[in-house]
Every structure is written in C-alpha cells, then in structure tokens.
C-alpha cells in the first residue's frame, strides 16, 4: 500500500453558485461553471480525464430537457462497463483500485423536485436506488427551519 489517500469530491451548490471541493491530501475548491459539469476522481471538467470527456460526449448527444430524462440517460452513461482495453469506460475495475459507488442528484427550485439516486458499488453491476424521499425531507425540513428562524428575527 502506498498510504496515499485517493480522496473524495464534494459538490456544494444552491440556485446561484456551486463549487467542488477536492478532498485529497491537499484540498482544493473549484467553482462550477454554468451548464454541464462532470467530475470523476480527478479535477472538475478535466480535459485530460477520458471519463469526463466520454460522459460529456454521451450526455450531449440528445436533448435532455428535464431532470428525469437527464438522470435516466446519466445512469446508463455511468454504467458503461469496461468491454475492451481500447474502448473508453466509465467504470474502473483494476487490481488496486476501482469504482466503488455512483451518485446522481438533481435539484429543482422546490424540495419536492429533488432527485437522489445512489448505487453502492460499480453501476454496471448494481442498480441505482432511489433515495429521493429522504433528500426531499431533509430539504423541506431545512426550508421550514430557515423560514421559522427568519420569522423570529
């Protein structure tokens, strides 16, 4: 083992701005740009990352005019398994590392529009499970608490 921490990426966003925090040995904050942003285990929208480029290509082939349609296509894109060494793949499966999970999130103006899907494990071998009710509950509770706090100030 190299004792090197591979890290994690956190996405923090609201209706006006968003950032990715690369939680590695040297954390870094990167602003989201308007439009499609893709991240794998490297930098946000990394032009050297074949998986980011593949995802951008596959996600822009058709008109994705709703969050539901986008997530339906994205779940298929992220489940693209390695079939040959020369074919790009979204899933990594090596001896020393690999895809451990995948998350799809869509946020709307209202909490009821939120969609949260997660798979523990590589998405080509595991189905995305829907955790939207949990996310909607968290968002609604936060909104209620913020309104209550604003009313008491």
Model-inferred region functions:
Residues 1-153:
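N-terminal nucleophile
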